């Protein structure tokens, strides 16, 4: 029985990066051998075992073959006769198909076992598939795209791009379950340069299948006086990357991705203006969230940003009444943290333009001040003062909030 660290741990050590992955493969063992050594079996589809002390997962070396469409359509074989090279050949990329022995202290020891040229591709900053078996699992397209967002200086080998296109053309991407698509997209959004993920998905044609609402933004013009980058798709990528550069949360990054979807449906005779794109975008966003089963925190923030980002940008022109209505529509009094994240997404939108990355965004501080002023109003006391006239409560509370905002910001109520 020999234990190896495989994949990310070896790759990241060679790159001089802290490892986010720790996967182990055991060669020359049977399930009975593992249990006899104190490991606990947990795998459903193939033998995976928990270490008796660290609880880390150890998988028996295995081979696999395709049996059906989709990422679950595989049959596996594990046995003491499966070699390390046979296990590594089923992996996605050469840079992930390397192994190294581990000692009793979990240190990587001995030579790097690299039968498929992973070290060469690391040096060349290249993503290359190990074998044509790559085509058997469509999730690998998403994984390559996600790796591109993490290792954004890497490029995809031309032959790998061609193979990814074949997978897309064969309809394999359409068979992916929504939860797995969202899992990979959300991971990619949280990497250092999320735009690279979408670049790769566009290059192989997968984005048009997975997120057609986003894919159609490329080539859609915007007014150059507001958007020197002109292309809407380019703008959205700049917005996502800005959000990533300030360490924004997943909901903010998703909102950044989805804020301008409505521009993809602007009538041609209206271009490069996009009147009403916010409302059109909300409908498209709802469809994406339902299709991919997007978590509620991401969905709710993205909807607020898609609907209100234009008003938030223009809010420096608003009086106290309009500011208060905007704060109320955003539900900022009940959900102040979400409101702050909406403002961050809008700041990313404003700065995600050519030449605007360092521009001030006074709208955020102004709206936060308006929110705080509106929140200072004692709605309970107003309700009590209204007595039986309950139909007046909402209007009186709103007027009190407007007055508080006007006083805080030193402006007229209208």
From Swiss-Prot:
Cofactor(s) required, per the database record: Mg(2+); Ni(2+)
UniProt-listed InterPro entries: CCA_bact, HD/PDEase_dom, HD_domain, NT_sf, PolA_pol_head_dom, PolyA_RNA-bd, tRNA_CCA-adding_enzyme
Family: Belongs to the tRNA nucleotidyltransferase/poly(A) polymerase family. Bacterial CCA-adding enzyme type 1 subfamily.
Note from the entry: A single active site specifically recognizes both ATP and CTP and is responsible for their addition.
Pfam families hit by this protein: HD (PF01966), PolyA_pol (PF01743), PolyA_pol_RNAbd (PF12627)
EC number of the protein: 2.7.7.72, 3.1.3.-, 3.1.4.-
GO biological process, alphabetically ordered: RNA repair; tRNA 3'-terminal CCA addition
Residue positions binding ATP: 8, 11, 91, 143, 146
The name this protein goes by in its record: Multifunctional CCA protein
CDD domains on file: HDc (cd00077), NT_ClassII-CCAase (cd05398)
Cofactor note: Magnesium is required for nucleotidyltransferase activity.
Gene that this sequence comes from: cca
Sample GO molecular function, one term: ATP binding
Keywords: ATP-binding, Hydrolase, Magnesium, Metal-binding, Multifunctional enzyme, Nickel, Nucleotide-binding, Nucleotidyltransferase, RNA repair, RNA-binding, Transferase, tRNA processing
Keyword rRNA-binding: no
Function, as annotated: Catalyzes the addition and repair of the essential 3'-terminal CCA sequence in tRNAs without using a nucleic acid template. Adds these three nucleotides in the order of C, C, and A to the tRNA nucleotide-73, using CTP and ATP as substrates and producing inorganic pyrophosphate. tRNA 3'-terminal CCA addition is required both for tRNA processing and repair. Also involved in tRNA surveillance by mediating tandem CCA addition to generate a CCACCA at the 3' terminus of unstable tRNAs. While stable tRNAs receive only 3'-terminal CCA, unstable tRNAs are marked with CCACCA and rapidly degraded.
Subunit structure: Monomer. Can also form homodimers and oligomers.
Keyword tRNA processing recorded: yes
Residue span, HD domain: 232-333
Sequence positions that bind Mg(2+): 21, 23
Note on domains (UniProt): Comprises two domains: an N-terminal domain containing the nucleotidyltransferase activity and a C-terminal HD domain associated with both phosphodiesterase and phosphatase activities.
Reactions listed under catalytic activity: a tRNA precursor + 2 CTP + ATP = a tRNA with a 3' CCA end + 3 diphosphate; a tRNA with a 3' CCA end + 2 CTP + ATP = a tRNA with a 3' CCACCA end + 3 diphosphate
HAMAP family: CCA_bact_type1
Binding site for CTP: 8, 11, 91, 143, 146
